[in-house]
Regions:
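Conserved, structured core segments of small domains
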Residues: 1-116
Length: 116
């Protein structure tokens, strides 16, 4: 089994627009999304290594200093799968795609021997 970093992405502007919706509309959408997540987890949850988290506000650090920025990362997971293609297949019908313009990036997680 190989480890992969999964990034659940959506344009920041889409999320900002979603937050402007009436709270009852958002809550209904959240209930639908949770049901989709529960179903997906039932079928594919064994891939997850136990690390899934939402991404908070971004502080970018460069050689020139640090600043607050917006990016499109909503959440991340660490998963195990036989291959990157197998991981991609499992995520093809993920409920994250209920978010307009949402996408999922899956990349190999290479452990750096001196960093672990």
């Amino acid at each position: 089994m190989q480890k992969f970093l999964v990034l659940y992405m959506a344009p920041a502007r889409v999320l900002e627009e979603w937050m402007k919706l009436d709270e009852s509309v958002r809550k209904n959408q959240e209930v639908e999304m949770k049901a989709g997540w529960d179903a997906w987890m039932q079928a594919n949850g064994s891939m997850l290594t136990g690390m899934t988290a939402g991404a908070g506000k971004t502080r970018r650090v460069t050689s020139a200093g640090a600043e607050d920025v917006k990016n499109d990362v909503m959440m991340f997971s660490i998963i195990e799968a036989e291959s990157q293609d197998a991981a991609a297949t499992a995520f093809q019908n993920h409920p994250h795609f209920g978010i307009p313009e949402g996408w999922i990036d899956i990349m190999p997680a290479h452990v750096l021997s001196r960093m672990s």
